[in-house]
From Swiss-Prot:
Belongs to the allantoicase family. This is Probable inactive allantoicase. PANTHER family: ALLANTOICASE (PTHR12045), INACTIVE ALLANTOICASE-RELATED (PTHR12045:SF3). One of its GO terms (molecular function) is allantoicase activity. It comes from Rattus norvegicus. Gene3D superfamilies: Galactose-binding domain-like. InterPro entries: Allantoicase, Allantoicase_dom, Galactose-bd-like_sf.
Length: 413
């Protein structure tokens, strides 16, 4: 994730940087090919950490660099690499980060993309240690089968700014609703790039879903996304719906300490703190559906987990969602249906809970987690069944419920 905004305001500019990096090594991104890796291998492009600089560090090939840097080209052509996305999905925007590359950065670049089947890339040979080397003839022959030169352009040839602190990030919006699995980064003619961030939303094949097992309907890998929040001082809510287990306290949603907390805290007869305020985050599900299981993980939040939380759901059209974003989610209380009542949370622990879905009559499209008074949550999993499956099967051996879905909702299908 990029650096997060401090308060709950969704800006229209560079919103995509709060989405998941589909190419990151953390989610399974992989470099399949690079024409040249002389000063720095292309694998550096998809590292999850920010680039660094070591002033007096050298390798046998030259200055140590934290990025992909090719040799000064002395043959016809230009350099390029192919990356397999760790999460297949819709690309919303791209950040070509040139940090610490000033006299050696790539002056121009373009990005192409394709939607390939898994068996298409089986003949690509694995990459070994590539520093100081160029692609072999065998690798060129194998990658030619992908015909990557003819892939669709997401970003045409564009000039890049040098890697100075105030100009190292080169942002590009992507206007495409297609699903992509691979990208090709072209640099013209040679040089260095520190990081390539491919921001977007995951997209899964819901038709191929196993109808017998609940699925995490809010997972960012499938298309879930945060569409509003009250505070994200130390970590964006999208972190909660990330891939895999949390890696550290930075890999979660954490708010600032509320300034309206009482000078002396008191509890009620049920063991909950009596505090005036709370924090919240709203998510659009990857697919409308019914939530049957809720997982709330406070791992790594040992001295800063919330006292309690609750989860609610609602059903909104796309236009209603856009209106709520403008209104900072001032949705009338009666529109929210309880999925989880106010529940005490324990620090550094995963909480597995049943939802109140059996009481609901409608499929939900959005979910809201509310924490009191403040603090951090590392993971939120909302497991259940997509609406198409719910219509075909009973829920928990109960009589068939009536599900309805308002017209006008655009799911990530």
């Amino acid at each position: 994730m990029a650096d997060t905004p401090k308060e709950g305001k969704l800006t229209r500019f560079l919103d995509f940087t709060q989405l998941i990096d589909l190419a990151s090594e953390c989610v399974g991104g992989k470099v399949l090919f690079a024409t040249d890796d002389f000063f720095g291998p292309a694998e550096n492009l998809i590292k999850s950490n920010n680039p660094s600089f070591k002033e007096n560090e050298y390798t046998e090939f030259g200055k140590w660099v934290d990025g992909w840097e090719t040799r000064r080209k002395r043959i016809p052509g230009h350099d390029w690499c192919v990356i397999q996305l760790g999460i297949q999905g819709i690309i919303r925007g791209i950040d070509v980060d040139i940090s610490y590359f000033s006299g050696n950065y790539a002056p121009r670049m373009s990005i192409q993309a394709a939607n390939l089947s898994e068996d298409t890339v089986t003949n690509i040979p694995p990459r070994g240690v590539k520093m100081g080397a160029a692609a072999t003839s065998e690798e060129f022959v194998a990658i030619t089968e992908l015909k990557s030169h003819s892939w669709d352009y997401l970003v045409p040839m564009s000039e890049l700014k040098p890697g100075d602190p105030d100009s190292s990030h080169n942002y590009f919006f992507v206007n495409s609703q297609q699903r992509w699995t691979h990208i090709r980064l072209n640099i013209f003619p040679d040089g260095g790039v520190a990081r390539l961030r491919v921001y977007g939303t995951g997209q899964r094949d819901w038709a191929a879903l196993d109808s017998t097992e609940p699925v995490d309907l809010v997972a960012i890998a499938f298309g879930g996304v945060c569409v509003g929040f009250s505070n994200a001082h130390f970590g964006h809510p999208n972190n909660m719906i990330g891939v895999g287990d949390p890696k550290s306290i930075a890999d979660g949603w954490e708010t600032a300490r509320r300034l309206d907390r009482p000078p002396v805290l008191e509890g009620n007869e049920n063991g909950f703190l009596q505090v005036p305020g709370c924090e919240w985050a709203v998510f659009r599900l990857a697919h409308p559906g019914v939530i049957t299981q809720i997982e709330i993980d406070t791992k790594y939040f040992k001295g800063n987990s919330p006292d309690s939380c609750k989860v609610d759901g609602c059903i909104l059209t796309t236009l209603e969602e856009e209106d709520m974003i403008r209104q900072k989610w001032s949705l009338p209380a009666h529109k929210w249906k309880p999925l989880l009542p106010v529940t005490k949370l324990t620090p550094n622990q995963n909480h597995l809970l049943d939802s109140l879905t059996l009481e609901l009559q409608d499929v939900i499209t959005h979910a809201r987690i509310t924490i009191a008074p403040d603090g951090g949550v590392s993971r939120l999993r909302l497991k259940g069944f997509p609406s198409s499956i719910c219509l075909l099967r009973p829920l928990r051996e109960k009589p068939m419920l009536r599900f309805s879905l308002k017209a006008g909702f655009r799911a990530n299908l």
